[in-house]
Structure formats: structure tokens, C-alpha cells
């Protein structure tokens, strides 16, 4: 299982690539550099997974993974970022922006810090300057016919990967960032302008052409930055707007709001959120037909929406702050990482909206789905945590396959999967009791001979609710637990008054014993609740209120609920 998967590990001891997840993993490439002065600072795969690039503080090098054939090697010691163009025809490198020479020199100009190389022949193609590391990357159309980058508040568009002279220019006064749409032509570009004084912030979407016509627009207040995310088809745009300081002092995270622009209709809507609080994550499903939002004060909520911004499903609240879809969009992970040390991970079937399994992997700082959509890696990395660094491979059923630990002072920095094609969407299996018992981290005991040592957490039952001794089932069996009043009177004490229930700490008598509801009773209760909700919705319609599409759909299913309820109550 996962024998063909390839992954790269970068640590304080260098880096290596391996194929396979278990003990039989084969080393594909390895470079051991024990000195931090020559450690690997950055690596990257090409989009098709055939090439691997890295910088080890000596050179920047690109080679073929399958053959180890060197494609490019240049003396760039300070490379901090590496980017492959969408079709892997070009490589871009970024170095920190710096000015060389005497500080008193006149007309000082920084050295160009972004270089473009052709991977077909290894030749240097172009060079330009990018002052900010956060926004150095040019953005490309999928066919590489178009490249765009921002200079000041202007977006320059280039063709043929030549950054010496732009072909088109879009000017938006005060703009701070942009997002070029993926998908087939015509491409669109979204540009964000922060709020200034009484002037609201805005996002404008232009069609890329000589005239740059506006096809979408959204204005909003309380925003000094925005993250814009296109769906895979380039037809819808999510805008996560935020302001760093919450003037009401209710949130450490500032204030956030979420908007959606549909390019085909030109409509823009506010994405409705049922709970107040910060927005931790908003991500598109790779299929482009839905997106998930994690939001609200802890315990946080996760809601799924269709491309029109209408809620279609939400989960119960819990300790989570991120979501991750797998490559096929049929499994989504809802998790709490980073400052949520518990590391709870919930895997959901996207189509059926049912939870597959839930496990806990504490102190997780890095997560990555494998290209097959079934495996994933969890890591504890430096500098976030400098002790107990490790990486673990898992199957989506919650079963751990392998783990590797780094003893202090060794540090783990990064683990990434190699992109690979040839995998197809798979059917999600329904877990058996045995599958669930094999899920979770193995329990570690100081005593290696302890019977629970190395037993998966799923095999250990959670402690049940406390049952007072007088309600417990007798050890000899026979007879069920029940309240004292149900017991037969003791001979010789027939005239004794029955004992009154003893008050608890707050002076109130304890609640009487109630038997647990059966599955049929629970279903009937839920159906009755839905029928009552439908009655309220019908009354709102009679009063002339406008209902949401999902509320109208609920009303249409009234007969279905009544039919199911009648079957359960017969």
C-alpha cells in the first residue's frame, strides 16, 4: 500500500527522497550536509513530478527524479524560493532583496533578485527585481501564454516569458495584490484595493485584454488586506477580507468577512456565517463545485457551500482551525493544528456528508495529502517545535503505517509528496469495527511489557459515564441496573420508610435514572423535530417572509418525513 509514492524530507542533516512508506522504502536521492551553513534551504517539485529542484547554500540545482540526470546547475547560493511554470518549461528563483557596494554610493540600485531559466536548454532567460518575498511570484495562465506580476499598484502582463517589457498594463490606484484566474481563456484578473478613511475597500475583476473591462465588483469596509482564491474552473472567486485590529476587542485575530463573486453572472454576495468569530480557513473543493469554511469562536464550526454561496451542510462544533481536501475532492479533513495542540483530525466523506473516522495526532504542525488521495503525512517540525520532531504516514481510515523520529538536537523542517499522475477517484470504504480499532496513534508506555504498549488508540474504549454503585449491574449477572426504588424490600424492613434520594452538592436531588433511547426512538424524535420546524417555516411563508432555497427544500420534504415517522411509530 503506497509502495510507489515518493516523498522528500528536509532536515538539519540535509535532505533525501524515498519511494515507499514502510520499512522497505528505497532511497531515490540523498544529500547529507550536517553543517547548518550548507543545509538545504528550499526544495520544490515540478508540477508533473518529473523534476526536483533545491538549493543547498552552494548551488541551485535541478535534476530528473527517475534518472538523476542534471538539468540545471547554477551558482546561486542565496536562493530562498523556487517556482516552476505551469507546464514546467521554466524555472524561477528568488533571493532576498539586497543592495551591494558602499552605502555612500550614489544612485544605489538593488541587484535583480528573481531569475528565469529555460529548462529545455538550461539558459538564463530573464531577470527582474521583487522587493517583497510575500509577493515575488509571478502568476501564469495554465498554458503559459500569459504571465503577470505587480509593480507598485500596477499589474504588468507579459507574453513568451519575457519580463524585459510588458505587453499590457492594468492600473488600480492603491492596489496591493491580485489574483489571475486559472482555466481556459479568456482569463480574468482580480485586484484588491484596501479601505482608506471613509472609502471602502474593493475587489474588481477584469477580463484580461487591452481594455480590461470590469466583469465583477465588490466593496466592503473593515479591511486592510484580502486573500483571493479562484475555484479550479476560474468561474468563481472567494474573497477573505480581514482587518488586523478588532476595535471591539473581542478577537485576538482581528475581524474577517467572506465574499463570493460569480464571474458568469457578475453577482457578488456575502457568504452567510451562522456563528460569530474569526474565519480560520476558506478553501475550494478541487472539483470547483463547493467550498468549505472553518469559522467562529472556539469550538469552531465548519460549513460547506455551493458555488452560489448557499449553505448545504455543516458539522457539529469542535476544536478545529483548518480544512484540507484530497486530490479528488471526495474526502475532506477537518482538523485543529498549530496552537490547538490536541491535533484532532476528522475525515469526512464529501458526497455522503458522513464522518469516516476521527483520530488525534498531537502537536501536528504540517499536513499534506498524497497524490493518490488515500494517504497523508503529519509532521511535527521546527522552528514551531524544536523537540519531538517526527513525521508519520497514514491511511485515510486512521491507520498509521510508519513513523520516523528526530532526536534533539536534530530538527525536521519539511516533508512533501512528489506530484504523480495515474491515480483515479476511489470508492470510500465503510469502516468495520476492526478497522476502527486499528485507528489512531499507538499508545506509548514507559514499561515496554505493558499490555497496552503500542496498541492503537482506537482499540482502547473511551471511559463511559460514571455509574453509582447502587445502579451498577451485579457481578454475578442476571438482572439490570435500576434505581433503588425498583429493588424488592429487605425482609424485616417492610415497615421502614423508603430512603429519599440524597441531595447533591448544590442542594438539588439527583435526576432520576432514565434508560437510553433506542435507535428507532432517536430517529422518531429527529423526524418530529423536523416536522415542527417545517410548520414554523410554513407560517413564515404565510406571513410573506422570503425563505432560503434550502428552507424551501425542507418544506417540500414534509410528506417524506411524515411517511418515515408513521413507519417508526407503528
Swiss-Prot record:
Matches recorded under InterPro entries: TIF2A (IPR011387), TIF_beta_prop-like (IPR013979), WD40/YVTN_repeat-like_dom_sf (IPR015943)
Polar residues biased stretches: 493-518
One GO cellular component term: cytosolic small ribosomal subunit
Positions in coiled-coil regions: 519-541
Example GO biological process: positive regulation of gene expression
Spans annotated as Disordered: 468-526
Gene3D superfamilies per UniProt: YVTN repeat-like/Quinoprotein amine dehydrogenase
Extent of Low complexity compositional bias: 482-492
WD repeat feature ranges: 274-316, 318-358
Protein origin, superkingdom: Eukaryota
Annotated keywords: Coiled coil, Initiation factor, Protein biosynthesis, Repeat, Translation regulation, WD repeat
One Pfam family from the record: eIF2A
GO MF annotations in UniProt: mRNA binding; ribosome binding; translation initiation factor activity; tRNA binding
Similarity comment: family membership: Belongs to the WD repeat EIF2A family.
Known function: Functions in the early steps of protein synthesis of a small number of specific mRNAs. Acts by directing the binding of methionyl-tRNAi to 40S ribosomal subunits. In contrast to the eIF-2 complex, it binds methionyl-tRNAi to 40S subunits in a codon-dependent manner, whereas the eIF-2 complex binds methionyl-tRNAi to 40S subunits in a GTP-dependent manner.
Protein name: Eukaryotic translation initiation factor 2A
Organism: Caenorhabditis elegans
Protein's gene: eif-2A
Amino acid at each position: 500500500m503506497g509502495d510507489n509514492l515518493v516523498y522528500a524530507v528536509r532536515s538539519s542533516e540535509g535532505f533525501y527522497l524515498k519511494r515507499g512508506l514502510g520499512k522497505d522504502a528505497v532511497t531515490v536521492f540523498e544529500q547529507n550536509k550536517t553543517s547548518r551553513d550548507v543545509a538545504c534551504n528550499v526544495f520544490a517539485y515540478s508540477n508533473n513530478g518529473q523534476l526536483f529542484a533545491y538549493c543547498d547554500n552552494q548551488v541551485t540545482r535541478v535534476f530528473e527524479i527517475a534518472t538523476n540526470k542534471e538539468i540545471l546547475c547554477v551558482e546561486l547560493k542565496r536562493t530562498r524560493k523556487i517556482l516552476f511554470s505551469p507546464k514546467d518549461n521554466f524555472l524561477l528563483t528568488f533571493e532576498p532583496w539586497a543592495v551591494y557596494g558602499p552605502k555612500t554610493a550614489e544612485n544605489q540600485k538593488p541587484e535583480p533578485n528573481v531569475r528565469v531559466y529555460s529548462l529545455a536548454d538550461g539558459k538564463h532567460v530573464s531577470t527582474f527585481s521583487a522587493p517583497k518575498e510575500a509577493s515575488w511570484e509571478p502568476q501564469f495562465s495554465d498554458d503559459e501564454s500569459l504571465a503577470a506580476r505587480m509593480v507598485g499598484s500596477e499589474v504588468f502582463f507579459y507574453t513568451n516569458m519575457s519580463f524585459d517589457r510588458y505587453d499590457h498594463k492594468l492600473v488600480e490606484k492603491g492596489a496591493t495584490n491580485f489574483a489571475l484566474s486559472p482555466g481556459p481563456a479568456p482569463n480574468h484578473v482580480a485586484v484588491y484595493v484596501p479601505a482608506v478613511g471613509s472609502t471602502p475597500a474593493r475587489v474588481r475583476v477584469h477580463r484580461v485584454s487591452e481594455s480590461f473591462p470590469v466583469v465583477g465588483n465588490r466593496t466592503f469596509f473593515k479591511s486592510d488586506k484580502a486573500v483571493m482564491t479562484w475555484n479550479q474552473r476560474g468561474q468563481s472567486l472567494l474573497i477573505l477580507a480581514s482587518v488586523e485590529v478588532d476595535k471591539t476587542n473581542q478577537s485576538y485575530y482581528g475581524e474577517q468577512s467572506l465574499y463570493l463573486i460569480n464571474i458568469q453572472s457578475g453577482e457578488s454576495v456575502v457568504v452567510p456565517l451562522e456563528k460569530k468569530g474569526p474565519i480560520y480557513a476558506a478553501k475550494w473543493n478541487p472539483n470547483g463545485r463547493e467550498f468549505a469554511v472553518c469559522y467562529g469562536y472556539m469550538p469552531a464550526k465548519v460549513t460547506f457551500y455551493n458555488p452560489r454561496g448557499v449553505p448545504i451542510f455543516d458539522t457539529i462544533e469542535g476544536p478545529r482551525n483548518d480544512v484540507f481536501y484530497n486530490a479528488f475532492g471526495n474526502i475532506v479533513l477537518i482538523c485543529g493544528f498549530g496552537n490547538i495542540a490536541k491535533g484532532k483530525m476528522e475525515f469526512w466523506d464529501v458526497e455522503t456528508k458522513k464522518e469516516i473516522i476521527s483520530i488525534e495526532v498531537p502537536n501536528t504542525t504540517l499536513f499534506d495529502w498524497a497524490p493518490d488521495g488515500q494517504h497523508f503525512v503529519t509532521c511535527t517540525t521546527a522552528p514551531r517545535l524544536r523537540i519531538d520532531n517526527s513525521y508519520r504516514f497514514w491511511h485515510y481510515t486512521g491507520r498509521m503505517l510508519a513513523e520516523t523520529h528526530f532526536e534533539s538536537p536534530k530538527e525536521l523542517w519539511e516533508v512533501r509528496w512528489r506530484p504523480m499522475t495515474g491515480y483515479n477517484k476511489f470508492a470510500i470504504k465503510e469502516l468495520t469495527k476492526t478497522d476502527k480499532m486499528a485507528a489512531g496513534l499507538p499508545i506509548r508506555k514507559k514499561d515496554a511489557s505493558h499490555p497496552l504498549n503500542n496498541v492503537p488508540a482506537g482499540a482502547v474504549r473511551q471511559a463511559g459515564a460514571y455509574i453509582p454503585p447502587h445502579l451498577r449491574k451485579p457481578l454475578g449477572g442476571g438482572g439490570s441496573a435500576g434505581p433503588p426504588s425498583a429493588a424488592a424490600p429487605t425482609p424485616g424492613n417492610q415497615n421502614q420508610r423508603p430512603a429519599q434520594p440524597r441531595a447533591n452538592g448544590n442542594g438539588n436531588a439527583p435526576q432520576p435514572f432514565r434508560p437510553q433511547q433506542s435507535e428507532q426512538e432517536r430517529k422518531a424524535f429527529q423526524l418530529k423535530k423536523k416536522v415542527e420546524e417545517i410548520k414554523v417555516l410554513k407560517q413564515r411563508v404565510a406571513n410573506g417572509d422570503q425563505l432560503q432555497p434550502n428552507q424551501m427544500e425542507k418544506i417540500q420534504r414534509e410528506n417524506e418525513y411524515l411517511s418515515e415517522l408513521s413507519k417508526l411509530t407503528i
